[in-house]
């Protein structure tokens, strides 16, 4: 067993145009002051990272990581959640997702997809330059508008969607393998990879690619009533990344899983700051330790109620309190009689 690293913080919800969130130097200092030891970097945030430079220049990456270390944090992983989303977009979502892309490819789905693929590949190369072994992203979605089986889905519709999704991602996964980096898909509603079954459907089509892995986030499982602890045991060999995020699901006689088109504040299922939701993180961290997860515990702060800076501060302490420093010996070693093969055979009557 290995002790999980952390706490880390995903900067996606914090990067902005106001200090200290508007530069790499200042945001890493801020994260360290909040108690974090690592940061996960949203590569679409140009005020923090020049992704192309990071992919093309080892010197740039050395300086980038050096600034973080000098300020007290490590770079845990890079993220292309927004770009990965654009690898596969159903036409119904074209306009909604267009803002994720560079201005020059908006309104052109084919060019936008090509741009997205290039972005993910740049991030994979940048990860290699930074010495990082795992990368966070979304799968995108072609079948999501048909998630509920009404009207009746035509035979082969979902299979065709997943065949195409695998076709788009396989060259990226091959490139990831060349860079020595795992692609960790955040299993998330709105993506075709939104639970274990859909991950397996994808995995089958990419021929169990060794670089196709999972970003585990229990909050997304709480909101769809999935057993988030059993999930860790089932996919322990594929879980290469961990978002620590809380959630609560409080159905009423008026709404349930679908949320009734309500705001996040008024939904039956909603994300919460760590400790304010229903996730049993004691059990989650125990499972992670028992299953030998050796990555980072990265706080992803999302809450419709609490101020983000309060959530960040509390999140660091929460993770510190839950990380299990794994034991190096059995608790009952004091009662050991030693190892003696002859004695073992006598005890067995052999």
Map each language-model feature to its residues.
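Acidic/histidine-rich catalytic cores of soluble enzymes
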Residues: 4-7, 22, 38, 78, ...
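A short, Lys/Arg-enriched amphipathic alpha-helix followed by its capping loop at the start of a domain
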Residues: 7, 29-36
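Active-site beta-loop-alpha junctions enriched in small/polar residues
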Residues: 10-16, 42-44, 80-83, 140-142, ...
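The substrate-binding groove and active-site-proximal loops of carbohydrate-active enzymes
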Residues: 15, 49-55, 104-114, 159, ...
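Active-site acidic/histidine proton-transfer and metal-coordination neighborhood
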Residues: 21, 25, 30, 66-74, ...
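A structural motif
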Residues: 36, 41, 73, 127, ...
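Glycine-rich, proline-tolerant flexible connector loops at the mouths of alpha/beta enzymes
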Residues: 41-64, 84, 139-146
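C-terminal helical cap(s) of enzyme catalytic domains, especially alpha/beta-barrels
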Residues: 308-331, 335
């Amino acid at each position: 067993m290995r002790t999980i690293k952390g706490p880390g913080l995903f900067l996606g919800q914090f990067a902005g145009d106001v200090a200290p969130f508007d530069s790499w130097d200042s945001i890493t200092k801020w994260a360290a002051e909040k108690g974090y030891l690592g940061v996960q970097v949203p590569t679409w945030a140009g005020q923090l990272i020049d992704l192309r430079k990071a992919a093309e220049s080892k010197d740039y990456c050395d300086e980038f990581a050096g600034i973080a270390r000098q300020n007290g944090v490590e770079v845990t992983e890079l993220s292309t959640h927004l770009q990965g989303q654009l690898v596969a977009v159903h036409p119904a979502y074209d306009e909604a997702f267009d803002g994720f892309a560079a201005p020059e490819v908006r309104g052109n789905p084919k060019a936008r997809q090509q741009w997205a693929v290039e972005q993910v590949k740049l991030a994979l190369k940048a990860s290699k330059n930074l010495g990082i072994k795992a990368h966070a992203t979304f799968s995108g979605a072609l079948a999501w508008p048909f998630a509920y089986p009404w009207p009746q889905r035509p035979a082969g519709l979902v299979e065709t969607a997943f065949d195409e999704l695998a076709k788009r991602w396989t060259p990226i996964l091959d490139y990831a393998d060349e860079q020595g980096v795992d692609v960790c898909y955040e299993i998330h509603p709105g993506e075709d990879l939104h639970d274990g079954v859909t991950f397996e459907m994808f995995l089958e089509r990419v021929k169990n690619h060794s670089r196709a892995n999972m970003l585990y986030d229990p909050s997304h499982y709480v909101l769809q009533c999935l057993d988030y602890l059993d999930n860790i045991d089932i996919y322990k060999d594929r879980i290469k990344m961990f978002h620590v995020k809380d959630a609560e699901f409080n159905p009423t006689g008026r709404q349930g899983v679908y949320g009734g088109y309500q705001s996040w504040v008024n939904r039956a299922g909603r994300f919460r700051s760590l400790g304010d939701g229903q996730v049993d993180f004691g059990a989650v961290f125990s499972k992670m330790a028992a299953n030998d997860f050796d990555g980072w515990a990265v706080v992803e702060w999302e809450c419709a109620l609490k101020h983000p800076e309060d959530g960040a501060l509390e999140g660091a302490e929460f993770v510190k309190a839950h990380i299990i420093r794994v034991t190096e010996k059995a608790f009952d070693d004091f009662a050991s009689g030693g190892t003696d093969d002859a004695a073992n055979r006598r005890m067995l009557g052999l």
